[in-house]
Curated annotation (Swiss-Prot):
Highest taxon listed in the record's lineage: Bacteria
Name of the featured protein: Protein YgdT
Organism, as annotated: Escherichia coli (strain K12)
Length: 48
């Protein structure tokens, strides 16, 4: 799995969350919100 040291420290997939401006403290909250939105969209439209 390819990643940079900064992303290893945050434990976030670099391809899905290329927002390097976010700090390690902010990123989990941001990615969690996005994952929840995506999950609801998949359920709503029956994707996958």
């Amino acid at each position: 799995m390819l990643s940079t040291e900064s992303w290893d420290n945050c434990e976030k997939p670099p391809l899905l969350f290329p927002f390097t401006a976010l700090t390690c403290d902010e990123t989990p909250v941001f990615s969690g919100s996005v994952l929840n939105l995506v999950a609801h969209s998949v359920d709503k439209y029956g994707i996958g």
